[in-house]
Amino acid sequence: MPIPVDTAQSISKKRKRKHGGNARKEEAAAPAATEAVIESPEKEEVTVEKKKAKKEKSKKQKVEHMSSDEEQKNTEESEQEASDNEEEKSDAEETPAANGEDLPSADTIRLPQQDGDPVKFTELGLSEKTMKGIEGMGFETMTEVQRRTIPPLLAGRDVLGAAKTGSGKTLSFLIPAIEMLSALRFKPRNGTGAIIVSPTRELALQIFGQVRELLAHHSQTYGIVIGGANRRAEAEKLMKGVNLLVATPGRLLDHLQNTQGFVFKNLRTLIIDEADRILEVGFEDEMRQIAKILPSENRQTMLFSATQTTKVEDLARISLRPGPLYINVDHRKEHSTVEGLEQGYVICEADKRFLLLFSFLKRNLKKKIIVFLSSCNSVKYYGELLNYIDLPVLDLHGKQKQQKRTNTFFEFCNAKQGTLICTDVAARGLDIPAVDWIIQFDPPDDPRDYIHRVGRTARGSNGKGRSLMFLQPSEVGFLKHLKEARVPVVEFDFPTQKIVNVQSQLEKLIGQNYYLNKSAKEGYRSYLQAYASHSLRSVFDVHKLDLVKVSKGFGFSTPPRIDIQLGSSLKDKPPQGRRNYGSQPGSKFKRKHNDD
């Protein structure tokens, strides 16, 4: 429901009601002051000096009158604020009821209207408790997406926003949602007033962390429901009352359908973050059901997406009210990636890929680096291999248990240096501080995936970072697709003499170590399956791969025998986009993230 904004007239009426007789006395006194300034023109004999003296006197009276009014107003406002605080405190002490309680109408809420785009958070007229949370997070100045989205969201508009990753959009939707909960004085017994839907567990956890910081000084409750977590514990918390809920689509739908005592009839705000990614990973049906179950009356919806697709537009139609505000902060930019990002590629034969990666990581031990691979088994193998040869790395992929993924993610976030090897599970939305390098060891599925991968570095308004993509000679056609997507890349040159040649030692190790050999075979098999499911098959043709060279990149002297078919059936199969974990592939050759 749109939250109306105060006009000058409504503010005046409120002031009359608030101050009662005092306000009327002030209005009655105002004409007298005006009359004192304007002298009758009929008295022509009054000298110029007298007129000047009278004007000076009247001005002085007017200033004194205004200052006394301000003092009186400030006194009354402080008294009113004190009574409001006492009332809020007594409300917070009430015990929550399990069956949920209707909220009073939101029609009385008034939020400040801004003249022009504000620059600092202090200009938004936010509540003192929210401002304390923002200051505690160390923010003062807003990013462009925050300047353009927060004011209309505070005014109750539905918003469809397009912004690059790293633009600061998380605060753009959290601040209005929290202000709404605070203004309506949500309590546990009122149930859930705001829901944030996120495509991945890691992104949901990150949003939840920012929610915790922003709500540190508020009395409203908050919680998170994600796949892989304890469902019973989540249900118990929902029944007690969670005012702001962060969720992944599958688990949210589960609770909406099956958790009795989950009160969401008072929902006022629905936020869909990374909508394109939610749909890409196979949650289209879940989102349609969620939109149908949640109450739409009096609901404000915010939908954010880095890219605009037909499916995103369809989701917007069923979830947003007619006439939403569309905000695109990227259309005026020359490039699709953030400024401050130096992007390059290196052309490298398949048998030299690991040697180059190993040499690069060895030379940059003091840097913070993320390496993207195409499958879970590849991540698992290279993580085990590098740690075994004393090059410490962390690994993150969809086959890990949720607790392991969470621990790894936060360990890397808090580290000042180190390497994280991961699948695209970490490529969307996650805000990992101070990443120096993004290494795309396995090429992305398309330019959109490239943009989201490199979005992990150079984040924020003044962020700096570098990106390096490995390409085989047969894959240089991908550069044309990047150029069409307005992605500026230049070729990086790595002198051959600086590449550490450990191929013979690697092959010997893989030949002798049973567990590494088994892991290498699984990684090799998954790499080929992922390559075969590329959507850009004109560029990434699995039949053009030199399997001898590819196998050397996994530590084999000759290609191992593996159970896989890459026959002619793929030639006739229409291109299929990559699917991520959480989806249900229906074909024999599943998805590029076959084991995500």
UniProtKB/Swiss-Prot annotation:
Which residue spans traverse the membrane? none
**May I ask which residue range the UniProt record assigns to the signal sequence?**
none
**Top EC class, one word:** hydrolase
Q: Which GO terms describe its biological process?
A: maturation of LSU-rRNA from tricistronic rRNA transcript (SSU-rRNA, 5.8S rRNA, LSU-rRNA); maturation of SSU-rRNA from tricistronic rRNA transcript (SSU-rRNA, 5.8S rRNA, LSU-rRNA); snoRNA release from pre-rRNA
Domain writeup: The Q motif is unique to and characteristic of the DEAD box family of RNA helicases and controls ATP binding and hydrolysis.
Q: What is this protein called?
A: ATP-dependent RNA helicase has1
Tell me the domain of life: Eukaryota
